[in-house]
Amino acid sequence: MGPQPPDESGVTWMFTKILVAIEDFDQSQNALELVKNVATDGTQVRALHLRERELSGYRWYSRESSSEAALVADAAVFEFRMAGLAAGGGVRHAVVDRVAEGILAEAREWDADLIVLGSPRRGEVIARLFGSVTQRVLQRSSCPVIVAPRQARGRQEELAAASSPRDHG
């Protein structure tokens, strides 16, 4: 069906199928919150965790076990369902440095009309040398992509410290 355009009342786009790529549950909180704020009644949400694998010799290795990967997706699905959203999720295997292709394939197969990603974790130098997952998804996606900002570490504490009187001795 695809996203619904604004109507004459100025209502913004409404997405019916949102795919959110979850790399790490704790680091993806801003992406999860963004999805909960964008989703409306009837929106379906799919949490996708890509389990990266690499070939070493004649064997495939992964940085995480199958159960660890499933927990990441399951935790996101649980959070979406607690917010009243129709949610499902899963784990997809991807070769290291082919994660973007895994996200895009899932979006195509599921017919997502919005992809939500967290901010990249790679450093700027690494991203320039090898490219970033976020950059590749943005360049190749056939549907809109939203990149949620990184979670502000200790932002409340920073604000409290900035507003408290200082001892200037």
Role assignments for model-derived ranges:
Residues 114-136, 154-159:
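Glycine-rich, Arg-bearing micro-motifs that act as flexible, cationic patches
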Residues 47-74, 98, 154-169:
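Acidic, proline/glycine-rich short linear motifs
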Residues 16, 113, 142:
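Conserved acidic residues
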Residues 140-155:
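Short, flexible loop segments at boundaries between secondary-structure elements
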Residues 7-63, 85-89, 168-169:
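Small/aliphatic-rich secondary-structure junction motif
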Residues 2-13, 81-115, 153-162, 166-169:
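Structural beta-alpha unit
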Residues 41, 133, 141-142:
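Short, structured coil segments at secondary-structure junctions
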